[in-house]
Structures are given as C-alpha cells and as structure tokens.
C-alpha cells in the first residue's frame, strides 16, 4: 500500500538544507512512499536538483517527489495568531491543507511549534471527544533487567500549559493508542507524572485524573511516576500537562549537554597520565552516544487531530528529520486518528 506525505520544506532552522536531503533518503529507502515538498517552487526545485545529484538519486525515485508551490514562510519566532490569520499561503499552512483535502495522508514540519499547533487545529479540527490536541514525543528508556534501550511516550509537551483532569484522561487514551500501535503492545502501561507515588500527593487535577484512569478498563493504568523514573522503562506512556512536560523535556536536553561538556572538560584538563584511561574509554563513549542518538527519537506527534501532523525538532539534522518522516508513515499505517476516535467513543 502506498502513502503520501506533505513536507513543510521551508520550515525549521535549516529549511531546505534539512528537508530536501531527508525527503530524498526517505523515498529512496521506502518504495511505497511519495512526498510532496511544499514551498517556494524555484528554491525547492533548485535544492532538489542539487541534492539529488550529490546523492546520485535515480529517476524512478525522483518521480515519487512532487513540488507544491507556497509563496510564504512562517518564521520560527512568528506569532501563532499571525501565522493562522495572515499567512494563508505559507508552506506550513498549505502542507496541512493537503492533509485536510485528502491529497496526502500526513504532514511533517520542523517549523514554529506554536504556529504548527494553532494552524493544525484550525485547519484539521480535533476528533470528537478531544478538547485539545497534545504534543507527544518518544523518549529513550533503558530496561535494567533486559539491558535494552526502549521508548517511552510522553505527553503533553507544551501544547496545553494548564490541563483539566478530563484532558489528562484524554491524553492517556491517545498516548496508549499510539504506544500500542508503535510498540506492538496489547496493553501499554500508562502513568501520570507526579511529585510522588503516594495517592495523596499532587494537584487536584492530577488526583482526579488518576481516579478517572482507575475506573477505565481500556487503560492499563500504573499509577503515579516520579521524574527520576522517566528513563527506567517502567511505563510506556507518561501523561502530564504541557507546562510540566515542556520543562521536563528541556531539562533533559540540558542535562545531556552538561554531561557531554563535563566529559570534554575532564579530557582537556587532566594530566597526560590520567588521559590514557580516558582515551582508552573513548570507544565506549562513542558506543554509548550512538545508542543514545537523539536523531532516532525525533518526531513529535500532534495527537487528537482529525489528520496526522508530525513535528520535527526545529534544529534537526537531515537524519533526524528523516526519522520524523518515518514516524508519520507509522501513524498512517495504523490510522491513528481513526483509532483514537473509535476508542474514545467506547470509553466516553
């Protein structure tokens, strides 16, 4: 079965220098994939010609890539309201419009998160039973028993700063459906992020959401999870409001940079004798870094919409953006919006 994805070719910090090579690699590796590059036709065509020559892409592959002109671009610091009201011919808006009219099956963008969420909600609307869409991201998790690296889905990561207990309940259902489809699990484990594991701890909306989840047979609810256990692979879905989720995600990113800086500092400031064991450990560090390659975790889904929209990190590399494309493919295959709709109808 073939599938088609629109790409906001102009979006993100690096624009065409990221989206074009990623699109070429994706269609080269997946013969069922077609891509529509949305953006300034002249600029997109020029970049496509250049990168296709560099990568030696053959004609049959190039024939599965089309260009759809859009005269405007949404800036990374642009107001979401301006993007929705005034940038009606932006590469982001047009790419999402193609999802709405059925021309493509999904959209991928590395553009402004707020603008992408606002535009997606305005154009596609939410499925019945969902008040507001949520941003979900797959985090790396390490199972101490099997010694295997896995994924834990976390939502919301910034779309909704304040959430009611009902909205957290909806997020749990959507996250469970995504985890079941992506990880092949019959009953994904779902947990609420809280300041402690005891039932009396936390804000009222979290405690009330916990009661709703306890009474839902559809959800394999595990109770509360603390921040220190996010990476322990003790759950498959972590639910929180967008404020807590966004702060948590950015703290994780900062922690990784700190660890990398400390390793570099220890190498440069130690004596020659002390550098020997550090140098001998470099292959181990490289292996560890490869296992924790964040490129393989890129691609945040905007869950709860009637169509599929995947958000790539704004500063993503071509490899990372390619991963976001594959995330969209996965959601197309499992028809995530329809599955969410059907599941909500059963429990609400």
Curated annotation (Swiss-Prot):
It is found in: Cytoplasm. It catalyses: a fatty acyl-[ACP] + phosphate = an acyl phosphate + holo-[ACP]. Keywords: Cytoplasm, Lipid biosynthesis, Lipid metabolism, Phospholipid biosynthesis, Phospholipid metabolism, Transferase. The keyword Disulfide bond does not apply. One of its GO terms (molecular function) is phosphate:acyl-[acyl carrier protein] acyltransferase activity. GO terms for cellular component: cytoplasm. Its EC number is 2.3.1.274. Pathway: Lipid metabolism; phospholipid metabolism. It is an enzyme of class 2 (transferase). Signal peptide: none annotated. GO terms for biological process: fatty acid biosynthetic process; phospholipid biosynthetic process. Catalyzes the reversible formation of acyl-phosphate (acyl-PO(4)) from acyl-[acyl-carrier-protein] (acyl-ACP). This enzyme utilizes acyl-ACP as fatty acyl donor, but not acyl-CoA. Homodimer. Probably interacts with PlsY. This is Phosphate acyltransferase. The lineage of its organism: Bacteria, Pseudomonadati, Pseudomonadota, Gammaproteobacteria, Thiotrichales. The gene is plsX.
């Amino acid at each position: 079965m073939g599938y088609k994805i629109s790409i906001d070719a102009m979006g993100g910090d690096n624009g065409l220098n990221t989206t074009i090579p990623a699109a070429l690699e994706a269609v080269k590796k997946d013969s069922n994939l077609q891509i529509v590059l949305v953006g300034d036709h002249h600029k997109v065509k020029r970049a496509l010609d250049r990168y296709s020559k560099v990568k030696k892409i053959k004609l049959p592959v190039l024939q599965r890539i089309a260009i759809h002109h859009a005269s405007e671009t949404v800036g990374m610091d642009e107001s979401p309201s301006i993007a929705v009201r005034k940038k009606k011919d932006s590469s982001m808006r047009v790419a999402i419009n193609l999802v709405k009219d059925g021309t493509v099956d999904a959209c991928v963008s590395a553009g402004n998160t707020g603008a992408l969420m606002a535009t997606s909600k305005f154009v596609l609307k939410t499925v019945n039973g969902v008040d507001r869409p949520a941003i979900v991201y797959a985090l790396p998790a390490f199972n101490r028993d099997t010694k295997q690296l896995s994924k834990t889905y976390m939502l919301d990561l910034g779309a909704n700063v304040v959430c009611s207990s009902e909205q957290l309940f909806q997020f749990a259902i959507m996250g469970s459906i995504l985890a079941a489809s992506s990880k092949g699990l019959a009953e994904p484990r779902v947990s609420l992020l809280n300041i402690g594991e005891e039932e009396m701890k936390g804000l009222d909306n979290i405690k009330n959401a916990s009661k709703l989840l306890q009474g839902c047979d559809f959800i394999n609810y595990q109770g509360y999870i603390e921040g220190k256990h996010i990476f322990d692979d003790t759950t498959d879905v972590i639910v929180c409001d967008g404020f807590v989720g966004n702060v948590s995600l950015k703290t994780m990113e900062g922690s990784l940079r700190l660890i990398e800086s400390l390793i570099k500092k220890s190498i440069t400031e130690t004596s020659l004798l002390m550098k020997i064991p550090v140098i001998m450990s470099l292959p181990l560090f490289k292996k560890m870094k490869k296992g924790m390659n964040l490129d393989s975790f890129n691609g945040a889904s905007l869950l709860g919409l009637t169509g599929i929209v995947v958000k790539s990190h704004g500063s993503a590399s071509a490899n990372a953006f390619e991963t976001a494309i594959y995330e969209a493919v996965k959601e197309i295959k499992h028809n995530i919006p329809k599955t969410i709709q059907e599941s909500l109808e059963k429990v609400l």
